[in-house]
């Protein structure tokens, strides 16, 4: 009966492929264009538009093993991970789906056959629930499948009726449970003991047969569908005779690795489960492009990492450890998900860097928390304490709650939320947002795009829009948007800028400045340059050819750059964003550190070599799964149709792309990197240019080089040598100037000592030194203290920009009476500043030189009271 988790995953897919289902790869953990979801949390998420009827697929049956995350947002299992047998932040959902193909009879039959024949589970161990009004499903289970009627339970809508939202597709569901036997406590679903571990839900079959309207009424769908989900970890536990998901082969391998790297000896410690669970969600999220940050999905990832690190320290980890477990994750899941191996270097680097950052404050934060708990009255940690740990030491509130839970305490969530709200209010800045009419505009039309084949064509004006409202006509000088029946204008997508050009009419010209999409309609923005435009007018659309061609060259360059980066830095490099314009490209990609000069040189060489090879740029239409299996690069977070456009440039680059491109790579002429920088944790940006735009950049650079040659009296051959000589000479002069200033300061100090005053037997120097470098004040004070042996010095100077610099020095024998920090702040206050330092030396600044004389006059009376 025992099967490995990997065998079950593959066997499930094979079973349904043999039943005529299309095997579909897991969708991204980051849902595309679905603001209702923080992370993908069910197998049906990637098919949502198919169920809604807004997306057509080439098949009507599908099967998948979907990676899911439930942490943060509405669906959040984070707090329970490690404390229960079946809660995880990351899990896999096995599923089979029907889009208007088969329905209840086949879905129930497939599930029963898989469980009892393919897996060999005893039939008397399986119980079933049905929606209490779904007599059809009940009849199938009892009369056709042969399940004992006492094992078929009717359950209400709360647990056995599923809906996508308040409106839309919905329907009853049927759940299958496994009975672990009388030795395990718990009762059947629907009873008071249902939360026990005896009866475990393993499969949920949803029958989407209704469409719910806003008024609550429901009507039958013309083509009912099926959505099913079975947790891989749960069915693996049953097949491996385990009562906890954490006892299955996959988790046992991870738990042993956690124990190894942390030095833990008790393999039953709950913290081992926490860390083993968290390496899965963290590894997969980073592979899917999520980076640790302080907001949104990135903050959820950061919370999970920090929770894992804290539990690792509980286990005894003394050094950075979390990234070391990733290797075991690859061992356990790398065959099913090759991306884990491809991005190994990148993921480990991100995990290590994040842990190192948190480790700096973890111990101190725990000390603060322990101190607060020692003085805590009651069982609730105050919200302001929770906020302090978050704001100062980076403790997410749920991490503090986790620690509190271990000690039988809770946190004041309302108080924490209030403190957070007050911080946001303090940090809030006024922002003005323009209205994006393309997002508010609803145009029930599909524009035919002809721009791959031609840059001009005839069309009819179907809609005119001004500031989000439909109009019938635009006159000369009016700005607005034009929607056509067909267009050669490419609409902004995939980072490529929208086309510009003209719409020529019999009685006018509309100048197109940009093109975007609204649904399936292409929206041409611009103004009427001459005459007028009316709905139903015939137009001749002409794209700005030179601009389009330049954009196409830069778009092709992003593909070559992407490939070159992966060849140079590793396969962890993936595109995170891009901007393709007529005169430049901007390419964002995943990488953990700045590129060295050698790496940039290698990338540039590889791209230009591909340009010199003059590869033909070939485009093909392919099935999405076929394209992925051919190793065509798919962009993170991008949603693709079933038929995709694949752009290939020799054997150098193959990507899924709907943009416009050069005909051959040689058309790019020359590739030149302008800059490389970091824009976020783990994300770098390259700005570059090709073609005539690159020629222009080189011309400008040569002009600057010629100008530099003239200034240093050199030429292109010895320019570097001349500049080095100039820099060396400058450093020598700077050193001489510094030495002269030091001598002047020393002399000034000697003169000041001669004029020192005495206050109660103590030598005191108070002076405003004009023209001295503020950096030399400290040296002057040190020299004066050494010469006086016992005394107090207060010096000030005003720079050319009216900035006041202050310093106070107190000899060691006097610091019990006078603290340098208190003294310097006495003077700093009137000049609009403050400072600090050691008891014997402190510095401050200010911005009100007019008050300096009065401020220095405060020193003597103040010292008289203390000496």
From Swiss-Prot:
Comment text on domains: Consists of three domains; the N-terminal catalytic domain, the editing domain and the C-terminal C-Ala domain. The editing domain removes incorrectly charged amino acids, while the C-Ala domain, along with tRNA(Ala), serves as a bridge to cooperatively bring together the editing and aminoacylation centers thus stimulating deacylation of misacylated tRNAs.
Family stated for the protein in its record: Belongs to the class-II aminoacyl-tRNA synthetase family.
Function noted in UniProt: Catalyzes the attachment of alanine to tRNA(Ala) in a two-step reaction: alanine is first activated by ATP to form Ala-AMP and then transferred to the acceptor end of tRNA(Ala). Also edits incorrectly charged Ser-tRNA(Ala) and Gly-tRNA(Ala) via its editing domain.
Compartment list: Cytoplasm
HAMAP family, per database record: Ala_tRNA_synth_B (MF_00036_B)
BP-aspect Gene Ontology terms: alanyl-tRNA aminoacylation; negative regulation of DNA-templated transcription
Recorded name of the encoding gene: alaS
GO cellular component: cytosol
SMART domains for this protein: tRNA_SAD
Residues where Zn(2+) binds: 555, 559, 657, 661
Main subcellular localisation: cytoplasm
Cofactor: Zn(2+)
Keywords of this entry: Aminoacyl-tRNA synthetase, ATP-binding, Cytoplasm, Ligase, Metal-binding, Nucleotide-binding, Protein biosynthesis, RNA-binding, tRNA-binding, Zinc
Catalytically driven reaction(s): tRNA(Ala) + L-alanine + ATP = L-alanyl-tRNA(Ala) + AMP + diphosphate
EC number from the UniProt entry: 6.1.1.7
Cofactor: how and how many bound: Binds 1 zinc ion per subunit.
Record keyword Zinc present: yes
Molecular function GO terms recorded: alanine-tRNA ligase activity; aminoacyl-tRNA deacylase activity; ATP binding; tRNA binding; zinc ion binding
Pfam families reported for this sequence: DHHA1, tRNA-synt_2c, tRNA_SAD
Name of the protein in question: Alanine--tRNA ligase
